[in-house]
Amino acid sequence: VLTPIVEEAVKPIAVWLGAGMITSPAQGFALGALCGAGFALFENLAAAATGGMDWTLVVTLRIGTAIMHIANTGLMGWALVGAWRERRFLRLALVYAWAMLVHGSWNFLALAYGMSSLPPALGMAAEELSFSAPYALPAIGLLTAIMFASLIVMNRRLRPSPYMQLVVETPEASRPDSRV
C-alpha cells in the first residue's frame, strides 16, 4: 500500500528539484519519463539479480513494469511543471492519484499472480488472492497497453506541431512603414 504512495512522489525527484528551471510541461514530461526509465532500470536489475528465475523470463515480465514506471513518472513530471508554471494544482493531484491507482493495481495483480503458484496450505489470504490469478495476467497486459497508449498520446499532444510557424520580430517588421 505504501509503495505506490512513496514511489510516485519520489521517482520524479529531478523534476521536483528543477521545476523552476524547466520551461514547459512537455519538458517536465520528458524529464519525468527519463526518471521513470532510470528507476525501472535499477528495479529490473535488482529483480534479475535475485535469481530463482530465468533471466529472459524476468526481463520479459518486467517490460510492462518499465512501461508503467516511465508513463507514470512522465505524467507526474508533466503535472509537476504544470503546477509550478501554470498553477494547475488539481491536475497534479489527479495525476498523482492516477499514478498511485495504477501502481497499486499493478502490485496487487502481480501479488495475486505470484500467490497462484504457492500451496493452498499457506492460509486463507493466499487462497483468496490465488482466486484472482487467472485474471491477473490479462489485467496486467491491459494496464501495460493503457500506459503505453498514454505515452503515445502524451508524446503527440506535447510535441510541437510541424505546422506552427515561428514568428521572429525583426526591427524592419516592427516599423509601420515597412509593411507592404
Name the predicted role of every residue range.
Residues 163-180:
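Long, low-complexity, intrinsically disordered cytosolic termini of multi-pass membrane proteins
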